[in-house]
């Protein structure tokens, strides 16, 4: 059983609200979950403390058990100082058209 810490959408249409949950990766996004760890309200101001609430003790416990955080939850854990998020290796950006034509000899 692959366990994931992820966001489950709640709220109404046009008013998103997310619960931070531990769930089996095979369960639907908004379906069954094992435990609720907190919430995230994206409509609040970014500097508002009530925008994100996590039970960090439970999060650390699940990470120790092998749960993998989703990309967004990994960002939250990085800002909370629980777990360092690895930087992604972005591919090189495309070469501008002028340089491409000059390299082709046209």
From Swiss-Prot:
Residues 84-106 are annotated as: Disordered. GO terms for biological process: translation. One of its GO terms (molecular function) is structural constituent of ribosome. Pfam families: Ribosomal_S16 (PF00886). GO terms for cellular component: cytoplasm; small ribosomal subunit. Keywords: Ribonucleoprotein, Ribosomal protein. The keyword Acetylation does not apply. HAMAP family: Ribosomal_bS16 (MF_00385). Belongs to the bacterial ribosomal protein bS16 family. NCBIfam families: S16. This is Small ribosomal subunit protein bS16. It comes from Rhodopseudomonas palustris (strain ATCC BAA-98 / CGA009).
